[in-house]
């Protein structure tokens, strides 16, 4: 039996003043895990807390694209191989719920209007997301990784994208191996400059490194030094098959928090 744990972040560059907001999401996940809930449930519900918090660029706090539109991405992957992701959704305060709904479906990815039609058919809330200009201290993604008593690991990520990008742009969040990666024994989530994360296949490479060397922090340091373009601001969170989760960033700030159950 594994010891439940969770780690979450509020985005690269978000600033330490948002740490308490991240800690609230971690507390929700911890409560679910302590009561015997699954890693998927814990990761999704904690991600919903972050999506519902307007200080983050995800869900209700998502920023405008260059044309004034508000387009939301989200993803989830589980260590048993299941995944779901959605791209460029409108009128969806909690896109992570749509992504999670795909975990047990034949398809695992949806985009745009088709994603919203699917969500309508599944009874997932449809409501306007008004959007906002970016804050001075940018934040582009939220993410949660949870491990339950069975040893299952799940990673949930969500974003409103970058405010200086066009409406058709796809960042790292919904791309497997880039903004997220989970396999047996490890889960990784990334945040920051999506193009750099994508070109570096960052989350997959960090996960492979962790499984190879067995050290979360050392693997993150290696990735930030060796897998990215110069000056790309990026943060990473990771959780292994045992022990606590960890977070690390080369940006000025990345609020992150972790929890592990008592033995």
Predicted regions and their residues:
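Alpha/propeptide regions of enzymes that mature by internal proteolysis
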Residues: 1-263
């Amino acid at each position: 039996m594994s010891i439940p744990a969770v780690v979450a972040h509020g985005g690269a560059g978000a600033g330490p003043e948002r740490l308490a907001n991240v800690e609230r999401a971690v507390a929700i996940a911890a409560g679910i895990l302590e009561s015997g809930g699954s890693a998927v449930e814990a990761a999704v519900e904690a991600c919903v807390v972050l999506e519902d918090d307007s200080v983050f660029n995800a869900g209700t706090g998502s920023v405008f694209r260059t044309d004034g539109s508000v387009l939301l991405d989200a993803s989830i992957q589980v260590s048993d191989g299941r995944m779901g992701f959605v791209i460029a959704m409108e009128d969806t305060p909690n896109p992570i719920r749509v992504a999670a709904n795909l975990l047990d479906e034949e398809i695992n990815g949806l985009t745009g209007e088709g994603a919203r039609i699917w969500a309508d058919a599944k009874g997932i809330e449809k409501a306007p997301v008004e959007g906002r200009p970016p804050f001075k201290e940018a934040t582009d993604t939220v993410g949660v990784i949870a491990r339950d008593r069975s040893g299952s690991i799940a990673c949930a990520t969500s974003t409103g994208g970058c405010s200086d990008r066009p409406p058709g742009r796809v960042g790292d969040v919904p791309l497997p191996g880039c903004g997220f990666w989970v396999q047996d024994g490890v889960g990784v989530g990334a945040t920051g400059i999506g193009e750099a994360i994508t070109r570096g296949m960052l989350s997959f490479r960090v996960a492979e490194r962790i499984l190879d060397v067995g050290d979360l922090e050392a693997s993150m340091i290696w990735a930030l030094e060796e897998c990215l373009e110069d000056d790309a601001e990026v943060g990473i969170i990771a959780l292994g098959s045992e022990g606590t989760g960890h977070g690390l960033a080369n940006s000025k700030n990345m609020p992150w928090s972790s929890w592990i159950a008592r033995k």
